[in-house]
Amino acid sequence: MATIIEINKKKALEVKNFEFTYAKADVPSVKKLSMPVAKHNITALIGPSGCGKTTLLRSFNRMHDLYPNNKYSGEITFKDRNILTSKEDLIKLRIQIGMIFQKPTAFPMSIFDNVAYGLKLQGIKNRTELSGRVEKALKDAAIWNEVKDRLKHDANGLSGGQQQRLCIARAVAVEPEVLLFDEPTSALDPISTGGIEELIVELRERVSIIIVTHNMQQAARVSDYTGFMYLGELIELGKTEEIFVTPKEKLTEEYITGKFG
């Protein structure tokens, strides 16, 4: 039985009895999992490799639907609807719930066009409006001052840390309500990692954030709530300080203290 804190706040998402099985797999990667996600807070998911945390993260905006024959059941509630139904508009969903991947994924186009890409998909064609929204997004991602004089340059000429902030700018440009971060700093140097962590904390005021990380120190630094997963199950979810200082589950304590990993 999982230990899950009662969150007396508005919820960005709520998961109920969610189970996910990859195509051709015999055992679910996520098993009957339930959890709330607090609105305008940062929730970290930690646990050893293969525990199901990235599988769960990618379920929040149905990224698994890009591949056939995966199976899922249960509910993931967002804006008072179960997003797992066949009626869900996945393009709209992925605008409302954006994702930042482990490896920076700058598109092979200019810096400006990278950020404008999603805006154009939304039907925004007016150049003045596009320019304003692109500038705002780049400022929100703390990269405007570094790129404002080279917006027409190829985005792949940016450093790794800059490309990751560009990806964040591209995601926030379409004004999502939730952002999903999948190991967003694992490919970056310590200085770039610090910058991304500061940015994630700043973004919390505008969006709800869920971050998967193998770095427990990172989870402790940036998150408000932390969930520990093991073998596809949520073992414990609580306030981050309590999870790291006074965990209620023995398995959580053993993982936090490095007895396994």
Swiss-Prot record:
InterPro entries hit by this protein: AAA+_ATPase (IPR003593), ABC_transporter-like_ATP-bd (IPR003439), ABC_transporter-like_CS (IPR017871), P-loop_NTPase (IPR027417), PstB-like (IPR005670)
Record membrane topology: Peripheral membrane protein
GO biological process, one term: phosphate ion transmembrane transport
Database matches in CDD domains: ABC_PstB_phosphate_transporter (cd03260)
GO molecular function, one term: ATP binding
Residues engaged in binding ATP: 47-54
Reaction catalyzed: phosphate(out) + ATP + H2O = ADP + 2 phosphate(in) + H(+)
Location in or out of the cell: Cell inner membrane
Keyword Membrane: yes
SMART domains: AAA
UniProt-listed Enzyme Commission number(s): 7.3.2.1
UniProt key word Nuclease: no
Main location: membrane
Enzyme class: translocase
Residue ranges occupied by any ABC transporter domain in the UniProt entry: 13-256
Pfam families to which the protein is assigned, alphabetical: ABC_tran
Keywords: ATP-binding, Cell inner membrane, Cell membrane, Membrane, Nucleotide-binding, Phosphate transport, Translocase, Transport
Cellular component, GO annotation: plasma membrane
Assembly, per entry: The complex is composed of two ATP-binding proteins (PstB), two transmembrane proteins (PstC and PstA) and a solute-binding protein (PstS).
Function in brief: Part of the ABC transporter complex PstSACB involved in phosphate import. Responsible for energy coupling to the transport system.
UniProt family annotation: Belongs to the ABC transporter superfamily. Phosphate importer (TC 3.A.1.7) family.
Protein name: Phosphate import ATP-binding protein PstB
Source species taxonomy: Bacteria, Pseudomonadati, Campylobacterota, Epsilonproteobacteria, Campylobacterales
